[in-house]
């Protein structure tokens, strides 16, 4: 290989024909039956349960990080995901979309011995996000939208 030539890399990703959950609900909510909504909710819970079985916390679940392909849920954006031991040994910061974030993450406790004790995102944080997503799937509305 010549010194001036550059290697090129390609990233191949699976295609999601219906885009994000947010887009899918905006476009198809009125035609979804309750069985469809329940199916999406079960798929979402199953996908996150699979992660948790391997002690992985997603940490950034929201309607923009859930993709839909042929009416099947695909979790995306694992950039903030952590193994449980990594999450519990590091300080967690809030990166995700606020309405989907575990409210405990905003409760900073100040004590004399520990000036700032940050809440560590965990499996329960993902479960909270799933609850918000399930509400969005069932209602068709953005969370906490006025």
Describe the residue ranges of each PLM region.
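Activation segment of protein kinase catalytic domains, centered on the conserved DFG
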Residues: 27-42
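Conserved activation segment of eukaryotic-like protein kinases, specifically the C-terminal portion
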Residues: 91-109
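Conserved catalytic-loop aspartate of Hanks-type protein kinases
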Residues: 126
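Short beta-strand micro-motifs within the conserved protein kinase catalytic domain, predominantly
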Residues: 1-9
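Catalytic-loop of the protein kinase fold
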Residues: 52-68
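Structural motif in protein kinase domains
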Residues: 16-26
């Amino acid at each position: 290989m010549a010194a001036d030539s550059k290697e090129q890399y390609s990233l191949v990703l699976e295609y999601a024909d219906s885009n994000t959950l947010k887009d899918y609900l905006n476009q198809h909510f009125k035609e979804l039956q309750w069985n469809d909504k329940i199916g999406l909710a079960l798929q979402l819970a199953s996908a996150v349960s699979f992660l948790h079985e391997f002690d992985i916390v997603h940490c950034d679940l929201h309607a923009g990080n859930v993709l839909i392909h042929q009416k099947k849920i695909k979790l995306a954006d694992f950039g903030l995901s952590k193994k449980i031991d990594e999450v519990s040994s590091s300080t967690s910061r809030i990166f995700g979309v606020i309405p989907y974030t575990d409210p405990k993450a905003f409760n900073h406790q100040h004590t004399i011995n520990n000036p700032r004790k940050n809440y560590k995102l965990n499996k329960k944080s993902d479960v909270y996000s799933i609850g918000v997503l399930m509400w969005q799937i069932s209602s068709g509305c953005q969370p906490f939208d006025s």
